[in-house]
Amino acid sequence: MSSSGAKDKPELQFPFLQDEETVATLQECKTLFILRGLPGSGKSTLARFIVDKYRDGTKMVSADSYKITPGARGSFSEEYKQLDEDLAACCRRDFRVLVLDDTNHERERLEQLFELADQYQYQVVLVEPKTAWRLDCAQLKEKNQWQLSADDLKKLKPGLEKDFLPLYFGWFLTKKSSAALWKTGQTFLEELGNHKAFKKELRHFVSGDEPREKIELVTYFGKRPPGVLHCTTKFCDYGKAAGAEEYAQQDVVKKSYCKAFTLTISALFVTPKTTGARVELSEQQLALWPNDVDKLSPSDNLPRGSRAHITLGCAGDVEAVQTGIDLLEIVRQEKGGSRGEEVGELSRGKLYSLGSGRWMLSLAKKMEVRAIFTGYYGKGKAVPIRSGRKGGSFQSCTII
């Protein structure tokens, strides 16, 4: 099937099919495309276009191949067990693009798939056909291969009428960009830990009855994000968070879903609680940035995008949400006229002491990282991270 024919079809207008930068960027990621939709709505056609576009390193797993009739999963427990085993085997083989073709109309089923994606460090993209008849049961009755009646189709419809919202939306870095930023962050921690100005301020990082001459910051920030790094835009809590539905329904969010972006990193920072990278958002990226997240208090009037960051690590008992709060406190201080004291030069730029155990490395040359805008749909809890390589299994990590 030629993907050139996709350009003229409105139902195939997705960035991952039409935007060449996105196609190239997805080649550097591990992505699980989960198709959702009623039988006859065009899922299988869409799945074939995705496979055709990405070719090598791509695998499709289709419920049709297991003779699963769309509907309640209970009647096909053995078939689904086999499908899931085959899907996990594909994950272990590190296919860059996996396509799962099924109705996926039940939340419980989706949650199983999200957990699998977490275990093998795949980013998830939910895809629904854009065909005009996708929710028209009268038309679907004629189009579906299973000869399901309109009443059968109506029973499946409620789970597909509303968008499934993630825990949060954000830009997820490619494996290559993630590794490069991670390495830069680790070097910063090592250099900062050895710097004489930092050693004078150790009291912010150790308790008073613990005399120390040095601290290993790489170990101190031991709570690390597994897999690829990300920059959160909107925390949705699966639709329960304030403003989540409104954010997800914005045209710019829908059009940008699974689209490639290049993010600019201007600085790295350390506080007694977190370490992260400061992200400078372009005008195009600010269009995806919520209006209400750049405040610590209602009276704050900080520049839009002030909170944009990538968490690189947290101290033991600290949650990842703290990284953005720490950055906002730094920006608030800057807005008040204090950029801190320049205390030296590290390999990547100038080092500033901001007081209270806070440090900023202003990068002499800003870093550019490639990322995909999508959602994180997992539980955000510790999961056993599995490697695609034989015998490779990592310890449980917390998604942050």
UniProtKB/Swiss-Prot annotation:
It comes from Bos taurus (Bovine). Its EC number is 3.1.4.37. It is found in: Membrane; Melanosome. A lipid is attached at C397 (S-farnesyl cysteine). PANTHER family: 2',3'-CYCLIC-NUCLEOTIDE 3'-PHOSPHODIESTERASE. Met-1 may be removed after translation. Exists as monomers and homodimers. Transmembrane segments: none annotated. This is 2',3'-cyclic-nucleotide 3'-phosphodiesterase. It comes from the Eukaryota. Optimum pH is 6 (in the presence of both hexadecyltrimethylammonium bromide and serum albumin). GO terms for molecular function: 2',3'-cyclic-nucleotide 3'-phosphodiesterase activity; RNA binding. Belongs to the 2H phosphoesterase superfamily. CNPase family. Pfam families: AAA_33, CNPase. The modification Cysteine methyl ester is found at C397. Substrate binds at T232, T311. The active site is at H230, H309. GO terms for cellular component: cytoplasm; extracellular space; melanosome; membrane; myelin sheath. The modification Phosphoserine is found at S149, S207, S338. Keywords: Hydrolase, Lipoprotein, Membrane, Methylation, Phosphoprotein, Prenylation, RNA-binding. GO terms for biological process: adult locomotory behavior; axonogenesis; cyclic nucleotide catabolic process; oligodendrocyte differentiation; response to toxic substance. It is a lipid-anchor.
